Amino acid sequence: MRNLKKMKQFLTLNDLPNFDAQVALAKEIKANPYQFEKVGKRKTLGLLFFNPSLRTRLSTQKAGRLLGMDVMVMNFSNEAWAIEYEDGTIMEGLRSEHVKEAAQVVSQYCDIVGIRAFATLTDKEKDEEEQVLQKFIEHAKVPILNMES
């Protein structure tokens, strides 16, 4: 895409290099949605949902396809093992996948990964840490897109 700096992560609007230019580009894309369909050719967008979603899921899948990307979606509430986020934890019982390995596996199959994970609303300090998002950023080898906060 024209004159856009490559970014490693897109976590907040503050990550955009020039917000006004991005808004103008969004309007241009809205008017001609397929103009960048070759940008994502031979690229895969992985979408990891740790919570239910309607608009975010549909709009992000559509955006990926408009960019020519293959899109893979995984719902962790019912399609995957529960993930452990704490280092040094023994993997047993319900948590049989550590985020470190999960992020590395996802990185092998995807060129960019979108993550949607709600706050738990049980521990304010942990919620502010955004543990799911931050652990994937730490361990993934591909750019991460925050689809929640």
Report each predicted region and the residues it spans:
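Positively charged, low-complexity intrinsically disordered leader regions
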Residues: 2-58, 62
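Catalytic cores of large soluble enzymes that bind and process phosphate-bearing ligands
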Residues: 11-18, 52, 91-94, 98, ...
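Active-site cofactor/substrate anionic-group-binding motifs, chiefly glycine-
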Residues: 44, 49-108
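Structural signal for conserved beta-strand scaffold positions within catalytic alpha/beta enzyme cores
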Residues: 12, 47, 73, 144-146
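Short charge-dense sequence patches
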Residues: 5-17, 83-85, 104, 108-118
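Anion-binding alpha/beta catalytic cores of soluble intermediary-metabolism enzymes, centered on
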Residues: 95-107, 111-149
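Solvent-exposed, non-transmembrane amphipathic alpha-helical segments
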Residues: 39, 65, 84, 123-126
